[in-house]
Amino acid sequence: MLTWLNRNSLDFPPLEKALREPNGLLAAGGDLSADRLISAYRHGCFPWFQDGQPILWWSPDPRTVLFPEELHISRSLAKVLRQSRYRVTFDQDFASVIKACAAPRSYANETWITGSMQAAYVELHRRGHAHSVEVWDQDELVGGLYGLAMGQLFFGESMFSRADNASKVGFATLVEHLTAWGFVLIDCQMPTQHLHSFGARSIPRQTFADYLSRHLDQPTDADWSARRV
């Protein structure tokens, strides 16, 4: 039975209560306050819903993750990186990145990054939890991604690309820095061919939960100050 959240409590049900079909649906309701979102990620779930639906919270089993040391760079992407065609920055234009991620894709008319979701993550960015990667072609924003950093874990949310390989360059650059900063895992949530091409793989939900308990409160050398990287 699906759990409906109490607006007066930030608690989530145990992950093992998530439905098998649809895979990982854990709870519904609540709100998108910054405190609830932080509680959700620390618990191992994330919001994902369409306009007109209640807020839905998910914790799929298995969980798709990327271990930074397992990053795979294809020969074609390595060539693009060597060419330094694009300029990559962190936290210089979070609002534009999430707005671009929210734009409907060619294969879908709707977006799950609703206006309320955008506002919620902009607030998380203001609080220092959510971060953006911007990819520039001269002064034009042509790609990027955003997510949350908590302890030694990075929770990827969405990416976009308006030029060849732009989002790939941003993601590869991010992983390079996360590795140097001491991050141990990148949460990719759900499997995609794009993520698997980078070396992402699926692990049991309980294994993911174990990583949360061990690494959420561990320090890193992260420096997200808005700058070119």
Swiss-Prot record:
The keyword Cytoplasm applies. GO terms for cellular component: cytoplasm. Disulfide bonds: none annotated. Pfam families: Leu_Phe_trans. GO terms for biological process: protein catabolic process. It is found in: Cytoplasm. GO terms for molecular function: leucyl-tRNA--protein transferase activity. It catalyses: N-terminal L-lysyl-[protein] + L-leucyl-tRNA(Leu) = N-terminal L-leucyl-L-lysyl-[protein] + tRNA(Leu) + H(+); N-terminal L-arginyl-[protein] + L-leucyl-tRNA(Leu) = N-terminal L-leucyl-L-arginyl-[protein] + tRNA(Leu) + H(+); L-phenylalanyl-tRNA(Phe) + an N-terminal L-alpha-aminoacyl-[protein] = an N-terminal L-phenylalanyl-L-alpha-aminoacyl-[protein] + tRNA(Phe). Keywords: Acyltransferase, Cytoplasm, Transferase. Its EC number is 2.3.2.6. InterPro entries: Acyl_CoA_acyltransferase, Leu/Phe-tRNA_Trfase, Leu/Phe-tRNA_Trfase_C, Leu/Phe-tRNA_Trfase_N. Belongs to the L/F-transferase family. NCBIfam families: aat. Functions in the N-end rule pathway of protein degradation where it conjugates Leu, Phe and, less efficiently, Met from aminoacyl-tRNAs to the N-termini of proteins containing an N-terminal arginine or lysine. PANTHER family: LEUCYL/PHENYLALANYL-TRNA--PROTEIN TRANSFERASE, LEUCYL_PHENYLALANYL-TRNA--PROTEIN TRANSFERASE. This is Leucyl/phenylalanyl-tRNA--protein transferase. It comes from Pseudomonas syringae pv. syringae (strain B728a). The gene is aat.
